[in-house]
A protein has these predicted regions:
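Formylglycine-dependent sulfatase
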Residues: 2, 7-9, 15-397, 402, ...
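Short arginine-rich
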Residues: 438-442
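Short, charged, surface-exposed hinge/linker loops at domain edges
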Residues: 443-461
């Protein structure tokens, strides 16, 4: 059945390519670089006074720099599922870490593969749910052909991976990001010769903790006592925040070096002029901000939810983009830029017309926490639905409006306007925009325990799917009958 549906995609793509006037004469390559836990503020071009990111700063000057990009659910697995499917966590059930992305979900590599793209994946996967060290066979790779990846490994030095059709463990040489970059460079060079468009996703594991695993030469660049903390880190967390920030920034600068090498390879092979380059992250990290312990995310504040998002596309002038974007918007936008038809399953919105026209739009980018987990106090982390606009962050909890920040005038989100009488009209307006987004995707915002029951999850003590090196019980979200059934688009159908 799946093979038949992919065949239908191929036929549809062929017809669409010949009929669509907006299809490029030569489809662009796509190089997608995704870091793990890199918050939006932690770059030189974003104004961080500590971190050294000369290569990303260079890329930013040539790119569309999205200043209001958010992770739809700021945790690893949910973001990655939304990125590859263009669908929201409440529609796929992928709102916990270590769940298995259902095989019937139509994903990025299958869509682009049907349009004759070569597809390659290097690095962290975290969508298989069979255990963090388990082999992922080709039929569970969602269309990625070239494969050097593993489910999840938080070591970052000599980490394991699998390649091809072999279940034999391999190990990256030295610091993972350096070795993964060399492999990505090799992939680019090989595909420069054959002329076939490719999509290559390089999914790095850093700067996710443990921060101490960063190379010593980079840690030496960041003495903890010299690190400047933002004003929203309370005194009780400042010492630890500086210690963690040393390794965090070291990982960032090491990865910046890798990105520079890949950009140079694109230029040397002549592919830079026809390659979409994206740099982003699956979510951010608190690092003590808002009183949330270093290493944590999932909370609604910008340090957790806002991510860097640079998109370099030949023919579109570099600029700062104020239009908000959320994870499910990324896939349809890339398809729009590449001239590939958008499948009906996708819920995100295609922003490519705005980008081509050089226009901005004050839209509401939706993000959420469906069922909280991790060791974060519930006054900081609870079920929420939120929107990011060009100016505001508005967050609603189950009991009503929770927080409202003016991000233009309150960069560090220290002044909550939600309870102010003078902000009542603004709260009402933003709540209406939030409710419109929820209605569009059929999300009736219920308690997390109800969502867990709806999707048939069995959770562990930490509130999420139990994880281990290998698992005998794989948890694949499957929606059950509820009191208020929600209709979702059919999966794996042709565009």
């Amino acid at each position: 059945m799946k093979n038949m549906l992919i065949l239908l995609l191929v036929v549809s793509a062929s017809i669409g390519a010949s009929a669509a006037s907006g299809t490029p004469a030569v489809r662009p390559n796509i190089l997608y670089l995704i870091a793990d836990q890199w918050r939006a503020s932690a770059t030189g071009y974003a104004g961080d006074p500590n971190v050294k990111t000369p290569n990303l700063d260079r890329l930013a000057k040539d790119s569309l720099n999205f200043r209001n990009a958010v992770s739809v659910l700021p945790v690893c697995t949910p973001h990655r599922a939304a990125l590859l499917t263009g669908r929201y966590p409440t529609s796929t059930g992928m709102f916990l870490n270590d769940a298995h992305l259902p095989d019937q979900e139509l994903c990025m590599a299958e869509i682009l593969g049907a349009a004759d793209y070569a597809t390659g994946y290097i690095g962290k996967w975290h969508l298989d749910g069979h255990g963090r060290e388990s082999y992922i066979p080709p039929e569970r790779r969602q269309g990625w052909q070239y494969w050097k990846a593993a489910e999840c490994d938080h070591n970052y030095n000599h980490s394991h991976y699998y390649t091809g059709n072999s279940d034999e463990k391999c190990y990256w040489e030295g610091y993972d990001a350096f070795a993964q970059t060399k492999d990505a460079q090799k992939y680019v060079r090989e595909h420069a010769a054959n002329g076939r468009p490719f999509v290559l996703m390089v999914a790095y594991g850093v700067p996710h903790f443990p921060h101490k695993t960063a190379p010593e030469e980079f840690k030496g660049m960041y003495p903890p006592e010299k690190i400047q903390l933002p004003p929203n880190v309370p005194p009780a967390l400042q010492a630890r925040a500086r210690q963690e920030a040393q390794g965090y920034y070291a990982h960032c600068t090491a990865l910046d070096k890798c990105i520079g090498e890949l950009l140079d390879t694109l230029a040397a092979t002549g592919l830079a002029s026809n390659t979409i380059v994206v740099f982003s992250s699956d979510h951010g990290e608190a690092l003590g901000s808002q009183g949330v312990a270093p290493t944590q995310k999932q909370v609604a504040w910008s340090e957790s939810a806002q991510v860097p998002f640079l998109l370099r596309f030949p023919g579109i002038a570099a600029r700062t983009v104020t239009t908000p974007i959320t994870t499910p918007d990324i896939l349809p936008t890339l398809l729009g830029l590449a001239g590939v038809d958008r499948p009906k399953t996708i819920e995100g919105q295609d922003l490519s017309p705005l980008l081509r026209a050089g226009r901005d739009e004050d839209r509401a980018a939706l993000y959420m926490c469906v069922s909280p987990f991790a060791n974060v106090p519930r006054e900081k982390l609870r079920e929420y639905r939120a929107i990011r606009t060009s100016r505001y962050t508005y967050v609603r909890g189950l009991q009503g409006p929770w927080v409202l920040y003016d991000d233009v005038n309150d960069r560090f989100q220290t002044n909550n306007l939600a309870g102010n009488a003078e902000s009542a009209a603004l709260v009402q307006e933003l709540d209406g925009r939030l409710q419109a987004q929820l209605k569009r995707i059929g999300d009736d915002f219920r308690p997390g325990k109800d969502c867990l029951a709806e999707w048939g999850y069995e959770i562990g003590a930490h509130g999420s799917v139990p994880y281990a090196a290998t698992l005998t019980k794989v948890q694949t979200p499957q929606r059950k009958a509820t009191k208020s059934p929600i209709t979702t688009p059919a999966r794996k159908e042709a565009p």
